[in-house]
């Protein structure tokens, strides 16, 4: 169900934390909720304060409002222009889609991203976009124009190359191969391209064969960096994902409870997983340095490397 809403501001400042230093301080979400239906999505919490959550049915079927009720911010352009045009705005990097995918199914009808990107081009404002949809190719030319003016980072998220598993985990996202086509297409622009290999799901997508296939394809696409991260479970996401496992992979439910006694996976598991990832990234000569391309384009001091993530839960 789509519901149109009005907002008073478009950009949200991210609260500083001691856990990790992000390369951006501002989020822009043109939708609230996401129709891709990824069963591990960390952003399910974003509906809770609206008191719009739907509880699981007695039959145990998923019935998550985050996937079913999508709020469309129809005046996002006006709100965004007001903030970008303010004298106090310093053209900081904006992360587009912090708690939703900006190219989710609703975007095919509303086309808000085209207007947003045109405005970003007018103001020459740097942006980061991560998606699981090849709908972003619709805006290839717009993003290419913006990338000639300032820093643009186009990243895709890939968790598995197994289409059957991907369809189960991420029902309405584009197939994995189509996501890689996005990376290939954007290499003919000045945009930075990246692979977000997250979340890696224990017992489902963490097999070395799957990790190597994804990393090797990213290398073929000549991405500027790859950023892996293991699954983190808390709040609504934890409840939803365990329910998903019970319905689809009951044999690994108990191992998950043991591995995730807290929000993050067991440290021993993570250490071994990142050892494998480090080896594979070295084998395929993939950089884990997220910040280097941004430094080059914007002349900003170094803040973040892949190694910063290895000790943290993503």
Residue ranges and their predicted role:
Residues 144-147, 183-188, 278-282:
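Surface-exposed amphipathic alpha-helices with a cationic face
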Residues 134-137, 202-212:
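Active-site glycine- and acidic-residue-rich loops that bind
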Residues 1-31, 35-155, 159-167, 176-180:
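Conserved Radical SAM active-site core
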Residues 161-163, 170-172, 185-207, 231-233:
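Conserved strand-turn element in the central/C-terminal portion of the radical SAM core barrel
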Residues 2-13, 17, 209-314:
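Auxiliary Fe-S-binding modules of radical SAM enzymes
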Residues 95, 130, 193-197, 226-229:
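Short beta-strand segments at enzyme active-site cores
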């Amino acid at each position: 169900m789509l519901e149109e809403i009005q907002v008073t501001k478009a950009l949200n400042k991210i609260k500083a934390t001691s856990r990790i230093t992000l390369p951006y301080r501002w989020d822009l979400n043109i939708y609230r909720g996401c129709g891709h239906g990824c069963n591990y999505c960390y952003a399910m919490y974003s509906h809770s304060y609206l008191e719009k959550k739907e509880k699981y049915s007695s039959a145990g079927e998923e019935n998550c409002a985050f996937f079913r009720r999508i709020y469309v911010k129809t005046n996002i352009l006006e709100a965004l222009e007001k903030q970008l045009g303010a004298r106090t705005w310093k053209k900081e990097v904006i992360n587009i889609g912090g708690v939703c995918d900006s190219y989710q199914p609703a975007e095919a009808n509303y086309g808000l991203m085209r207007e947003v990107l045109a405005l970003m081009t007018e103001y020459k404002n740097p942006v980061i976009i991560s998606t699981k949809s090849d709908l972003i190719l619709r805006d290839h030319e717009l993003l290419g124009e913006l990338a000639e003016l300032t820093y643009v980072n186009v990243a895709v998220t890939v968790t598995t190359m197994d289409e059957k598993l991907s369809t189960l985990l991420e029902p309405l996202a584009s197939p994995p191969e189509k996501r890689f086509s996005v990376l290939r297409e954007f290499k003919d622009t000045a945009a930075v391209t990246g692979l977000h290999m997250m979340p890696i799901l224990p017992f489902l997508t963490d097999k070395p064969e799957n990790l190597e296939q994804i990393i090797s394809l990213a290398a073929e696409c000549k991405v500027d960096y790859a950023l892996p991260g293991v699954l983190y479970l808390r709040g609504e996401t934890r409840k939803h994902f365990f329910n998903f496992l019970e319905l689809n992979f009951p044999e690994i439910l108990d191992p998950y409870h043991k591995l995730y006694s807290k929000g993050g996976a067991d440290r021993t598991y993570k250490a071994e997983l990142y050892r494998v990832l480090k080896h594979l990234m070295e084998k395929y000569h993939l950089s884990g340095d997220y910040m280097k391309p941004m430094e080059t384009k914007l002349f900003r001091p170094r803040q973040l490397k892949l190694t910063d993530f290895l000790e943290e839960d993503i």
